[in-house]
Amino acid sequence: MTRPLIQLALDSLDAGQTLKLASQAAPFVDIFEIGTPCIKHNGISIVRDLKTRFPNKLLLVDLKTMDAGEYEATPFYAAGADICTVLGVSGSATIAGVVKAAQAHDAEVQVDLINVPDKLACAREAARLGAQIVGVHTGLDAQAAGQTPYADLQAVSRLGLPVRLSVAGGVNQSTVTQVKKAGADIIVVGAAIYGAPAPDVAAREIRELADGNHHQFIMSKLSGVLASTDRSHEARLTAMLEGSRRIFVTGAGRSGLIAKFFAMRLMHGGYDVYVVGEIVTPSIRQGDLFIVISGSGETETMLAFTKRAREMGARIVLISTKGSSTIGDLADLTLQVGTPEQYKKTVGMPMGTTFELSTLLMLEATVAHLIHAKKIPEEQMRTRHANLE
């Protein structure tokens, strides 16, 4: 099971207290929820304040929209909301309106199943309409009557819908593991944190209980990206390598480190390979292959290099998170690693690490493919490895 996200419900009417609590819990939570009472009392300004102070946190605005979905949600997405909620009981037209508003701002929608009689049917409809999150929610009044969300969570989880499941309703330290096992992708915590004597300590405890094994989480995320990557990439890239006179590789930042790793492995395989930017790298010519690693496909320095390589007649391969981009328009072949949705900040691995690590694994698989195809003995590869270290 992947690492669930922790969502903190900020329900205070006092904006100052809301910001203070957010600061205390920030190191341990992934999503700040501006609760319905808070957003009604403070208005859209609280969205802007939280987004300014915590730009790297996801921001959910619990609008509980009941009508006029697109019209109501649009200004909140424009102000910085990453997710807005719409009530499942509102009906398909209203949900579709919020989905439309979210799509216009590259954001997400959560459909709240609170008070929905047929939760399974509503969850299916939410997924069909394009919502990314379904919220299994037992409200405060229902909690007071002894109700919990756990049975409903398990039932919705068994549907296997292409959505993330959020659970809210009395979650605390004693129930975090239970809701995680029941299938929650997002665990919403309110009073267990904001009602604790030390909110930061409570948030850390819940974070630790939810996390489990970090190694398992990272492996699960990378496996998911590679599973959604076209398996023909290795063979297609190998064909490009085999048809080239020389190979030039490049990338910015961490992508550059991956490019250097790939260059070393190609050298082991007997290829004439160079890293762009090194003082000994020669000029690129027709018949050469230029491989650029850029997650966005828009990196300015990489774009300039790509244009020059195109002018000189080199063939170009882009490795990216996107199937279409400015650099991709210049490339002979674009190898998309995973899907764009897997690189949103909801994935739980910060600062873009998922792309770099996944690309590293894909390129290592390419090396394994070409070594097998060319029947290169490992002993021969070892003779090419650096011996001045």
Regions found by a protein language model. Name each.
Residues 40-64, 98-115, 147-173, 205-210:
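Alpha-helix-loop-beta-strand connector modules within alpha/beta enzyme cores
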Residues 227-243:
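A short, well-structured juxtamembrane/interface segment
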